[in-house]
């Protein structure tokens, strides 16, 4: 099970709700994924306008934990304002802190992310900061008291998978809170690898929403994450330079 703050979840897949071809496919993909946490950009959704159609109208919100993100924020102050707006809707008490420092790479601003995380923790939010694969930054965020850390596998929407698995492993090894791999996942193999490395969960959006068949991809990601976690718990064999026979040679007759 995945434990974030006071909440417990069966699924280790967190699903984004943007970029889908239409709301019906979005709903089907959400159901196929088995995800219990759904994330959305507050700036792209008018949560105070019931007359505007959005995915919240199509799903049973009591079945999911909503995770608003502060996408679009460039400063800590902007991120805090967006988080407060989401909380005021009454739908959410968790927030994914996302403060972008570079428009081309969409990599997070480490200084502003730290500031926003500290400010929101002081206000009582359950905070999940999106960060790079910087091991020291991940440690600093945990020292502030965040409830999970979300290092990116590679740039948002790039589909490049885990570019630096060593840093991800370092982050996981020293983690005192759940590590959820966020951004850059392109296919099921990437998601499975994240879990095999020991991640507690994976957040996906583009890999599912922009797939040729989002519903099938959502199911594939669900299975990949489950398989990766099982593999991690089972313990893979070590890599070796030379072969090791799997069949015993003792007792074999020599002709």
UniProtKB/Swiss-Prot annotation:
1-deoxy-D-xylulose 5-phosphate binds at residues 157, 183-184, 205-206. Keywords: Cytoplasm, Schiff base, Thiamine biosynthesis, Transferase. One of its GO terms (cellular component) is cytoplasm. One of its GO terms (molecular function) is thiazole synthase activity. Pathway: Cofactor biosynthesis; thiamine diphosphate biosynthesis. The active site is at 96 (schiff-base intermediate with dxp). It comes from the Bacteria. It is found in: Cytoplasm. Its EC number is 2.8.1.10. Gene3D superfamilies: Aldolase class I. Pfam families: ThiG. One of its GO terms (biological process) is thiamine diphosphate biosynthetic process. Catalyzes the rearrangement of 1-deoxy-D-xylulose 5-phosphate (DXP) to produce the thiazole phosphate moiety of thiamine. Sulfur is provided by the thiocarboxylate moiety of the carrier protein ThiS. In vitro, sulfur can be provided by H(2)S. Belongs to the ThiG family. PANTHER family: THIAZOLE SYNTHASE (PTHR34266:SF2). This is Thiazole synthase. It comes from Anoxybacillus flavithermus (strain DSM 21510 / WK1).
